[in-house]
Amino acid sequence: MALHPNFPQSPYAILDPAMRWFPADEALRDTSMDKLMPPLVSQLRNKVKEFRDSGYVGARDTSKSLLNWWFKTPHLLPKIDGTMQEFQYFFSQREALETIVYLYDVVGVQDKYDLMRFDSSGAVSTGMFDETWRRFVVKMATGAGKTKVLSLALAWSFYHKLY
């Protein structure tokens, strides 16, 4: 795998879906990129970028408030020397929460058929989903903060239901 030449060094920088990893072998980039990327990821990342860039159009008020609070409001934490330091979520955490909100509020995902609309590979079939519970698609690497995302998703779910 290779990274885009302009890939940011900061884990907080907002990534354009076109600037993710890509095959180092030039031939694979042209012929097999769609086979290397998990089937739902590519389309969803583009849709979530549009959702983010629009200011979360289509999200419920509670969802917008939480997303703006978590990701656009400065959160200052005291350091041991008494100075303040800004806390930020990793971009991967932000994108994961934005994806969940997008799928729930905007798309209205109810079942596997709703998710299959995002399959850009043609490789996903209903037989791959034996269970009937609602799914949300979040792709995160090891060490990217999945536990924190789960805690934010629980808080979002609680306040979303309450308000």
Language-model features: locations:
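The conserved Walker
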Residues: 142-144
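N-terminal accessory nucleic-acid engagement/regulatory domains that precede
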Residues: 1-87
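Generic alpha-helical propensity signal that fires on short helical segments
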Residues: 30, 107, 154-158
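Conserved pre-motif I regulatory segment
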Residues: 55-139
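Walker A/P-loop NTP-binding motif
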Residues: 99-101, 146-163
